[in-house]
């Protein structure tokens, strides 16, 4: 699946819920199924700066595609990073770099987060794209 197709699938899933309480519960469930980062990668190098909670993200390049693992000490934040990893993991770095992230606005996520969590979301996206840039440079 392309990033766009995955994002559309996420938007469809979120549209099935009537209210934000149900969406938060769904995000918590997504966080529980997050591919967890190995303890050795829970370092300052992998921590997302600008997040209210602690969030670690690690990327590996496998057959020209990035795979991400992550963890957070907060359940909602864990769900947020799970959504991003679902959208971007298994994709080519160039596709991640070029990807539009407006699906976040389509599901209404930013407007239902506190300002510090919304800043954290932006920082998570930025870090994922920075990993993609770093690995794309290696591929060239």
Identify the residue ranges that each predicted region occupies:
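N-terminal intrinsically disordered, cationic/polar leader segments
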Residues: 3-54, 61-65, 104-140
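A generic alpha-helix surface/boundary motif
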Residues: 8, 78-79, 98
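Short small-residue beta-strand/loop micro-motif enriched in glycine and branched aliphatics
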Residues: 65-69, 78
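A short interface-forming secondary-structure element
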Residues: 72-74
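Alpha-helical support elements that line or immediately flank enzyme active sites
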Residues: 80-91
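Glycine-rich phosphate/pyrophosphate-binding loops
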Residues: 90-107
């Amino acid at each position: 699946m392309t990033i766009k197709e995955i994002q559309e699938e996420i938007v469809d899933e979120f549209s099935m819920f009537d209210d934000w309480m149900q969406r938060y519960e769904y995000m918590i469930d997504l966080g529980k199924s997050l591919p967890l980062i190995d303890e050795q990668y829970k370092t300052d190098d992998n921590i997302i700066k600008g997040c209210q909670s602690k969030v670690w993200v690690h990327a590996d390049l496998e057959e020209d595609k990035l795979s991400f693992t992550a963890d957070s000490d907060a359940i909602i934040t864990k769900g947020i990073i799970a959504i991003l990893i679902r959208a971007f993991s298994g994709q080519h770095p160039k596709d991640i770099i070029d990807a539009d992230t407006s699906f976040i606005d389509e599901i209404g996520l930013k407007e239902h987060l506190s300002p510090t969590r919304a800043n954290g979301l932006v920082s998570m996206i930025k870090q994922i794209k920075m990993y993609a840039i770093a690995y794309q440079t290696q591929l060239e």
